[in-house]
Each structure stands twice: as C-alpha cells, then as structure tokens.
Amino acid sequence: MILDTSAVIAILADEAEGHHFREVISSADRVRISAAGYLEAAIVLDNRSAGPGLSPDLDLFVSWARASIEPISSAQARIARRAYREYGRGSGHPARLNFGDCFSYALSKDTGEPLLFKGEDFSRTDLVPAI
C-alpha cells in the first residue's frame, strides 16, 4: 500500500479519519511512501506550528507503519509528469493534483499498489484506493 501525504497528516494531526487509517496501515503487508511525499508531510507538519511542530513525530510514524521511503525513479518521474498533465491543478481536471500528489500517484501506478489518501482528489483519477 502507498501512503499519500494527506493520510499521514490525518493521522499525525489527529483528524477524524486518522484512527481508521491507522487500522488500515497496521493490517497492510507492505507500506511505502514516496520520498517527495515524505518531504511534503514534514513541510506541512512544520508549517502548522512554530518550531519543529509535529515533524519529529513523522519519523516515529514511519517506523511504526513499517513504511519504506521510496526514491523516485526515472519511470516514476515520467508517470508523475503525465499525471500532472492529465490530473494536475493546471489541467482543468477536477482531481487538481499538486506536486506531491503526482509522486504519490506515480508510486502507486508504478508498483500497482493501492493508495491510502484523504479527500476526493485521487478518487477522480484511475488509481485503486486502499479503502
């Protein structure tokens, strides 16, 4: 299963879906997050408060989830580029994927693994959702 930043933030910020997402992650055989998604999550968490915010919790979460931080391959970079052209904010498509979303999309597409995410953006693409 691939983690999108939105799912990570929902868990670490104690949002309503966070508990359910934790259950889904704990039952997954394999959990991965794109290196771009990992950085995006750290930036979002740091920007939510002065100082380090919740980003120190990110590494604890990654460890708990047994998530591997996946490097971006050239194939994934090309998939992300196509995803932005088709589903990105500038494309006019209702999914309106951002930069980080495109790398979550690419990792999910490249591996064939479902994506765990919060919101409606990815449900408007051709990806298989984890829930």
What name fits each language-model region?
Residues 8-9, 38, 122-123:
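A generic structural signal for short hydrophobic patches within well-formed alpha-helices
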Residues 68-114:
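Active-site neighborhoods of divalent-metal-dependent phosphate/nucleic-acid chemistry enzymes
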